[in-house]
Amino acid sequence: ISVSVGKGMTEIFKELGVDYLIEGGQTMNPSTEDMLNAIAKVNAKTIYIFPNNKNIVLAANQARDLTEDKEIVVVPTKTIPQGITAMISYVPEKNSAENIEAMLQAIEHVKTGQITYAVRDTRIDDKEIHEGDMMGIGDHGILAVGKDRMEVAKETVAQMVDDESEVISIYYGADTEEAEAEELATALEEAYPDCDVEL
């Protein structure tokens, strides 16, 4: 069971073998009841739940605690990329203890950055932000602020990439043109030749 946002991400999770998807998002966090309904619909003795948002982990844990007839394993994924990485690490032949260990190790190495618009003037992490500015938000705060989406995206990635980075995955929403995403991918390939860039 995975929480997902949007059609594109839902397709990715389906391709990775997720049996049941719950629509989520910043303003619509699934409840414990939503989780229990999903658990009831999945015909399996062991069910893995990927919350993919730190605000949903509690609901998933409560659903696990309220379920007695199935083994529920909550993988504490806090972002969609962590959820995707955890699913890729899943091996059906392994038991739940082996799988959770592999998944936890895998998500430990995932860094997530998001590019979004500022909805109001504010000051966060010593950065002056104005309504309409582009912001690059990482796992631990604001990484970049600016007027140009492409430049903010590049700076956000620059703040996250280190010597251990191997793969840079770009997921883009409906309001981003494919050509713009391809331009970013090309720029990142040139800037980080030791990393695989996926679009």
Language model segments and positions:
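N-terminal loops that bind phosphate or other acidic moieties
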Residues: I1-L199
